[in-house]
Amino acid sequence: MLRVALGAIWLVDGALQFQPFMFTKSFVSDVLIASAQGNPGFVLRPTISLAHWIAPDIAIWNAAFASIQVLIGAGLVIGALRHRPQLLRITLAGSFLWSVLVWWLSEGLGGSLTGGSPLSGAPGAVVLYVIAGVLLWPGPSTGEAQMPAPLLGGPAARGTWLALWAFSGFLLLEPANQAKGALSSLIAQAGSGEPGFVNSLLSGAAATLRGTGPWSTMLIALVMLAIGIAVAFDFHPRSFLVASIVLAVGIWVFGEAFGAILTGQGTDPNSGPLLVLFALCMWSGLAGAPASLQTTATGPGFAPEALTGSTSGVIAASASREKFAT
């Protein structure tokens, strides 16, 4: 299910890249070049050079970009549904390379070095594509229909979860995001160019928050840090995973305006859906963790079978996790 979901998001990416706007030079100036502004030279210079290089033939180049994303999505969906681990590995490896190039040459490192806000997508949706892909990488299988994801629930997954949410909270403490009215301005800007009902929703939210001081973004930063720490250290992990999903949906609606996909100029759904996917990956990892390391929804649990050597519960949980990861 998780691999199919990741593939579906890639397919949406590809479909959005086929929008008419993406075949014009406005895509080059308003998306590629704009994303590089304010970044260090190692981001700015190659991005500007690439933009000028592809601008004369942007229609051809954009068709290639969109096709790559569709192929990645199709490879993930087909590989997951037909239980083809080798196809999944090849597709995921290609997606990692593509994601790095997009993050560097098209997203300006997701605004990580320019005061970008995690409420509008920083540190970049493609970072989450890579994280999800690594966690769902199929390990050695013992049968044709088995495609385990050994990294789910492991220390690397928990460490990555903590690092992402802690860094997101740190970004919110940057001066640009601590200015008076910063949160209100971010929401109002997200609603610009959106259809009437979305614009009205975001305009109302922005008006409600107008004039708020840095306490609002500081509070969100603390929530992000708490989510990262709690899940990483098994403190009511499921409760905090639910909280992360609620926050991700809020970010997607109010900070990202559904990734601007309703404007005809959105290149991807942005980070909101991928944060939800990451949370579901972590949830699946909890379901498949060894019994002695499991935690209940109310706190750390104790499994007597861990002392007696019984493995039936672990095997059943691992089978459930494997099915969910497909």
What residue spans do the PLM features occupy?
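Extended, low-polarity transmembrane helix blocks
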Residues: 1-326
